[in-house]
């Protein structure tokens, strides 16, 4: 996958990425990022770096406002793993297929 890092950098360099309106935690740092250039670099490094899943969840769960989790994947998997973390409200966890079929929005 190391060869893919530069290819991903090159691909992302051609995309215009705006600063996110909401917090987005990066898999490689478990921290929120707003700078498009750093977001692109973190997305590239994701190919070869360990996902900081536990650290990311701890960050989310320690935020002052309740967090909603929307899993965007082929099949529901990660949302079920949230059961391992104290403080996760399962009513605020949804897979994208269910969200689209229900046309439900977290409030």
Swiss-Prot record:
Gene3D superfamilies: Malonyl-Coenzyme A Acyl Carrier Protein, domain 2. GO terms for molecular function: transferase activity. InterPro entries: Ac_transferase_dom_sf, Acyl_Trfase/lysoPLipase, Mal-CoA-ACP_Trans/PKS_FabD. This is Putative uncharacterized protein YmdE. It comes from the Bacteria. It comes from Escherichia coli (strain K12).
